């Protein structure tokens, strides 16, 4: 019975497919549905899995939806941080050990939303070296701030046990951030070629590039800020 329930969950749970040199394809349900007014030569109704194409080249005139512009501008979905063997050139994960908590940070997958800096500047000190002070606030405050990180670049450990995901389970959701990436929460599965989550990354939440300029595609690396990407969604 449990296996059947698991199968149903996998079918009903949304997924995001990254199409090579093309858009993201958000599939809300993996169960094929009959297409109205369409049949095969035997008169049998045809079924398909339906989804929504989301722009990731940054040039669609109908953001966040894809309008085919990626093929006109020659968009490339190549991840420039991988070598010929699809292995990361380098990982930038660092550990900042405090008295009660250790904060882990991977710069490679940071979307530069600056939630941590704005929320807890006594711990996350942009421009300082080291830029993280794990003793700069109460442990509970640090946990709350780390769990707000949209990209999954931040995580924490207490007594040698690492925590990468929020304490409460969240419903699957894709949020279009203003002038920024797609923020994914709730453990939506990401499928496609050459997908490499960074060291220590969360599978529950991550940020996907939609400006087209990230070097770490499909993940956001903050390039939308450098190129002044604009979308008021």
Where are these regions (language model features)?
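Surface-exposed interaction/gating patches
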Residues: 99-113, 172-195
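Hydrophobic, ordered structural segments
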Residues: 55-56, 60-63, 73-80
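Short cysteine/histidine-rich metal-coordination sites, predominantly Zn2+-binding motifs
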Residues: 70-88, 125-138, 162-170, 224-233
């Amino acid at each position: 019975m449990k296996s059947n329930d698991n199968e149903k969950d996998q079918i009903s749970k949304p997924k995001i497919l990254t199409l090579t040199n093309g858009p993201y394809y958000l599939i809300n349900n993996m169960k094929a549905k009959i297409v109205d007014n369409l049949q095969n030569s035997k008169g049998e109704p045809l079924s398909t899995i339906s989804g929504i194409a989301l722009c990731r080249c940054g040039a669609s005139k109908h953001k966040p939806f894809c309008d085919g512009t990626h093929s006109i501008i020659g968009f490339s979905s190549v991840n420039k941080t991988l070598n010929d063997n699809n292995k990361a050139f380098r990982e930038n994960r660092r550990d900042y050990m405090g008295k009660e908590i250790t904060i882990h940070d991977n710069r490679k997958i940071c979307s530069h939303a600056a939630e941590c800096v704005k929320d807890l500047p006594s711990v996350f000190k942009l421009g300082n070296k080291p830029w993280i002070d794990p003793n700069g606030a109460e442990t509970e405050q640090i946990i709350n701030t780390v769990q707000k990180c949209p990209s999954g670049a931040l995580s924490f450990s207490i007594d040698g046990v690492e925590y990468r995901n929020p304490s409460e389970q969240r419903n699957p959701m894709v949020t279009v951030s203003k002038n920024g990436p797609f923020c994914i929460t709730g453990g939506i599965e990401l499928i496609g070629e050459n997908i490499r989550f960074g060291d220590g990354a969360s599978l529950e939440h991550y940020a996907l590039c939609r400006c087209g300029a990230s070097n770490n595609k499909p993940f956001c690396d903050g390039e939308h800020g450098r190129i002044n990407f604009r979308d008021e969604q």
